[in-house]
Amino acid sequence: LWQARKKCPDLQVVPPHHDKYKHYSRLINEIYGRFTDMVEPFSIDESWLDVTASRRLFGDGKYIADTIRKTVREELGLTLSAGVSFNKIFAKMGSEYKKPDATTVISRDNYKKILWPMPVSEMFFVGGATAQKLNKAGIMTIGQLAQTERALLENMLGKHGSQLYDYANGLDDS
């Protein structure tokens, strides 16, 4: 906030409305519940849905995500972005890929094309300090992270390095 005020001295800061956020979060999660009972809230404005058992009734993951987005827009007047994938990490990254109102499918066939060219700092669970360490080692993209030997990443980052290797290669089974 101080950086924003420094760049824009006339900035008008509006106080947050936590009660409204919670209210809409609950309503959106109720909409999710119409499509699956496997809803895992991640934050006030994000949830993971497992729609595996819902596909026979509602259609594939992309169709379900698009239907949820349409329902939220029509009933609540809000937009949302959705990521559809074979694990939580890639689903989250898919939801970030096209904002503010889109569905992105990251599959086993396309994840290298979509995610690997991205800066390593865009990898879920790579914070600023980790990105700096990776960059210093010449690892600039998610693809380079994926192609780095696991042992080297473990040596650099400990257990987290091994996890990032799995995440970048789509080996996470969440």
Which residues make up each language-model segment?
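Gly/Gly-Pro- and Ser/Thr-rich, intrinsically disordered tail segments characteristic of DNA damage-repair
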Residues: 1-169
